[in-house]
Amino acid sequence: MASKSRRLSGLEISLIVLFLLMTAVSVALITVLALKQESDKKEEVTPEEPSPSVTPPEKPYLIGVGRADCTGPVADLPMMGYANTDQTARGLHTRLFSRAFIVDDGNKRVVFVTSDIGMVSQRLRLEVFQALKEKYGDLYRQDNVVLSGTHTHSGVGGYFQYTLFMITSKGYIKPSIQAIVSGIVKSIDIAHRNLRPGRIFINKGQVADSNFNRSPHSYMNNPEEERNRYEFNTDKQIVVLKFTDLDGDGIGLLSWFAVHPVSMNYTNRMVSSDNLGYASYIFEQEKNIGFLPGEKGPFVAGFSSSNLGDSSPNIRGPVCVNTGLKCDYINSSCPVGGKKACIAFGPGEDMFESTRIIGENMFKIAKELYGSAKQELHGPVYGAHQWVNMTDETVQFNSTHTGRTCKPALGHSFAAGTTDGGGEFNFLQGDTEGDPFWDGIRDAVLGPPSNETKACHQPKPILFSTGEMDSPLPWHPAIVDVQIITIGSLAVVAVPGEFTTMSGRRIREAVKRELEVKEPFTNAEVVVAGLCNIYTHYITTYEEYQIQRYEGASTIFGPHTLSAYIQRYRGLAKAIAHGTIGELPKGPEPPFFDEDKLFNQVRDPVADVAPVGTTFGDVLQEVNPVYKVGEIASVTFVSGNPRHSGDIRDTTLVTVERFHNDTGSWEIIHNDASWETRFHWIKGLAGRSQAKVEWHIPQTAQAGTYQIQYFGHYKQTTENTTVITPYVGTSAAFKVARSFYYF
């Protein structure tokens, strides 16, 4: 029987229509909301990376980054920076690295390398280019490769060919320079292999509470109208480059900031990358998740030196340590204790904490700038380079007035050192008179400076007339590199020494004026890269030179040094802007002295001897059974001389390992490049020595079972043979707890 259909009531029809309308409206609202969210995503630029959906408006650069270990010997060799031959290495705080950045515009390429070393010497640069030429022919040349040192004072020396520098670092030390040359070349190799299309963004900001002018009396001698243009007597600006691939993934950071890496003071005996190196370390550790420091993590963060000549990280300033009173403003000395009692201190309780604080300050601002960088660099890259005889430069001030540079000479205040450390005898900063006693000794031993040199350097009283001393080799260089590289609108002025704050400002302005007459430099950003290519001490302004504090006494080419450099760098900038680089004269090539003419005062280490009843790697002082986070786990081993380990690059002397119960295996959580580990070598008598390894247990350490291992080599000799043997020392297993109530 057919069912009878029921007619819908008016109420039911109304409800159905209302339901359909509400459904349609809901769908429409959801669609609009989805489209709006998608639109917002497209418009939003995240703070960490640029949107990969945005196609570069111009042909992208080829960019490559690379990092390589350049740590040399960590024992028994002089450290380079404080010019103290008694400050020899006795261990390892952090490893030293070379970081290379290559940019290619499709026609030309430029390379910037920043290395955790005191400075780049002429000898080092020439040996690097020998190695590069063997590998790459004329691809990497004097004009397109900049080599810069961070200026850590806690690296080993021995990579110079001029007598003065060889004296302070006990000669030309082959294992030291080989490690640095190999590390620099390897970092370029890695960057070369990793070249890919990418983008470069630039940003800048200010780093507070991280640098302090250690020679304010000199700075105040600059013209008042010039000083009034600046808020501070040191440069607070940090410039950051952000390197990404075309998908927007970050691959590198390169920055420049003006601060001396002397947070690790002159009492330090461990090789260390200091504050700039620590900033690189924590940035790379944050980016390279899952990699131990120094391993092949792909992200490279270079924190480079700038015009740091008078810029100290010891921001609490100098005080008389025996009274707590302020030091003398003019010569930085104290009524009791003289200049030795006048010491500047960093923000931390000790040099390690000060290093961490200054490094973190740079890291935090660089991270913010990296994340917010939106201004992109576009345009060609250029490199311009000349060799200049800085002993004979004529400076044209105007149509009627000229000046001359001088043969190198160091003033009496050079021997006074700075409030950051160094200095001997009764020498004081700010000395424009000299001392007949020391002049007499100099004349008897080294000979007096010529009248011409004395007149040229006025008002500097000359202590060492190094430009007139050439035994056994010249004491100072005469031929100096000047160089500029550009990437789009960015110009990097590679300077051969330590420019003071105002010197750096003047040269930046001069280069900027020359560049801005042409595209793409109409809004050029100019940075000073310090300690590049060759070391020539300090470069002050003419006015600062008159005061003759340490920096002025160390301006070796005389009062017109800065003016001569400005003239030369203006010439390079003009050639870049007008496309006439090829017309620049190459200049006189520097000497490359035969290795057999370079002296070495460092003796080979003697054979190692283990105490009776022990062997190498045995534990002499064992770890405690239990530690809590924040404490220091320490173990001492029978050791050989670390120099017997030879080339220690890409290895580790120390590991901290955590035991995994589930797998029954040990996992390395720290190596000797880690901030948390410290390796102390304790030299004894007659070939005996010890190695003390510390693990500064971080608050983030997991509770569990740990051990410390130490890897070394010992040397044994017989009448006809020398045998080098590896060994391993292992601590007892110990517990780490969040507190002592954990167990």
UniProtKB/Swiss-Prot annotation:
Which residues bear sugar attachments?
A: N265, N331, N389, N398, N451, N661, N720
Q: Which residues lie on this side of the membrane: Lumenal?
A: 36-743
| A single cellular component GO annotation | endoplasmic reticulum membrane
Transmembrane segments in this chain: where? 15-35
Which cysteines in this chain are paired by disulphide bridges? C320-C334, C327-C342, C406-C456
Q: What PTMs does it carry?
A: N-glycosylated.
Residue spans with biased composition (Pro residues)?
Answer: 49-59
Residue ranges that the UniProt entry lists as topological domain Cytoplasmic:
1-14
Task: Give the active-site positions.
Answer: S312 (nucleophile)
Positions bound to Ca(2+): D672, S674, T677
The answer to whether keyword Iron applies is no
Q: Required co-factor?
A: Zn(2+)
Asked whether the keyword Coiled coil is assigned, the reply is: no
Disordered, as annotated region = 40-60
What this protein is reported to do is described as:
Plasma membrane ceramidase that hydrolyzes sphingolipid ceramides into sphingosine and free fatty acids at neutral pH. Ceramides, sphingosine, and its phosphorylated form sphingosine-1-phosphate are bioactive lipids that mediate cellular signaling pathways regulating several biological processes including cell proliferation, apoptosis and differentiation. Also catalyzes the reverse reaction allowing the synthesis of ceramides from fatty acids and sphingosine.
Q: Give the protein name, as stated in the record.
A: Neutral ceramidase
State the gene name recorded for this protein: asah2
